[in-house]
């Protein structure tokens, strides 16, 4: 065996440094930064194209003319739990005073009616409602002459007189006693007529 030293190691300190693809040699302790290269056939992005601005989630896009419930009309925010005070309202049953147009307002128990007279002029006549024609004169308006009158009454023999006469005969009251009910006005029917034009108005029957 010879005593010559072994040849130098290929990766020893005397080996030449490796070069990057760009041609710059790598220094000891420094690594090449990773560069993202687009795949073949895809163009590089332009520097003028910027990503869209970031919008935080949960913010709805306001509609034109819409005012959120927590925002006033002038754009200011109201604190949570705050509600504007209600406007003034009149109490129930209150009617504000004011001028009312004049008109023919009927009184209690009556209504107004317009009657055309032969001359062609319109005349307003008040007809009383709810009048009860009984055994006494009644104040009303004559439907014929349109005058406010008090009716004239007259008595006529009616059904109640005949019923009482037959009852007297059944009880044995004969010899003309059965005719006594026909002489009593409280048992007769009452006819109401107009004292002005003598027209018939109504008949009150004691017994229908």
UniProtKB/Swiss-Prot annotation:
Major location, coarse class?
A: membrane
Please give the GO cellular component terms listed in this UniProt entry: cytoplasmic side of late endosome membrane; cytoplasmic side of lysosomal membrane; nucleus
Q: Which amino acids does the record list as binding Zn(2+)? A: 142, 145, 194, 197
For this chain's UniProt record, which GO biological process terms are given?
apoptotic process; intrinsic apoptotic signaling pathway in response to DNA damage by p53 class mediator; tumor necrosis factor-mediated signaling pathway
List the biased-composition ranges (Pro residues): 1-13, 50-67
| InterPro entries from the UniProt entry | LITAF, LITAF_fam
Q: Does the keyword Transport apply?
A: no
State its location(s).
Answer: Late endosome membrane; Lysosome membrane
Provide the LITAF domain boundaries.
122-206
Q: Does the keyword Ribonucleoprotein apply?
A: no
Chain positions covered by the region annotation Membrane-binding amphipathic helix:
164-184
Q: What is any Pfam family matched here?
A: zf-LITAF-like
Q: Where is this region: Disordered?
A: 1-70
Instruction: Report keywords, A-Z.
Output: Apoptosis, Endosome, Lysosome, Membrane, Metal-binding, Zinc
MF terms (GO), sorted A to Z: metal ion binding
Membrane topology qualifier: Peripheral membrane protein
Main function: Acts as an important p53/TP53-apoptotic effector. Regulates TNF-alpha-mediated apoptosis in a p53/TP53-dependent manner.
Q: What is known of its domains?
A: The LITAF domain is stabilized by a bound zinc ion. The LITAF domain contains an amphipathic helix that mediates interaction with lipid membranes.
The UniProt entry's sequence similarity note says: Belongs to the CDIP1/LITAF family.
Name recorded for this polypeptide = Cell death-inducing p53-target protein 1
């Amino acid at each position: 065996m010879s005593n010559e030293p072994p040849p130098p190691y290929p990766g020893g300190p005397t080996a030449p440094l490796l070069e990057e693809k760009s041609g710059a040699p790598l220094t000891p302790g420094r690594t090449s930064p990773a560069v993202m290269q687009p795949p073949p056939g895809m163009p590089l992005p332009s520097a003028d194209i910027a990503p869209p601005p970031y919008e935080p989630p949960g913010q709805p896009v306001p509609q034109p003319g819409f005012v959120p419930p927590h925002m006033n009309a002038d754009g200011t925010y109201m604190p949570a739990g705050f509600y504007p005070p209600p406007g003034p309202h009149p109490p129930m049953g209150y009617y504000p005073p004011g001028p009312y147009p004049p008109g023919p307002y009927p009184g209690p128990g009556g209504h107004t009616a317009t009657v055309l007279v032969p001359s062609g002029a319109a005349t307003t006549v008040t007809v009383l409602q709810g009048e009860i024609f009984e055994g006494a004169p009644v104040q009303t308006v004559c439907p014929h002459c349109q005058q406010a009158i008090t009716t004239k009454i007259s008595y006529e023999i009616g059904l109640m007189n005949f019923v009482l006469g037959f009852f007297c005969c059944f009880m044995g009251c004969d010899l003309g006693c059965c005719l006594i009910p026909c002489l009593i006005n409280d048992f007769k029917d009452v006819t109401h007529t107009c004292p002005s034009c003598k027209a018939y108005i109504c008949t009150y029957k004691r017994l229908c």
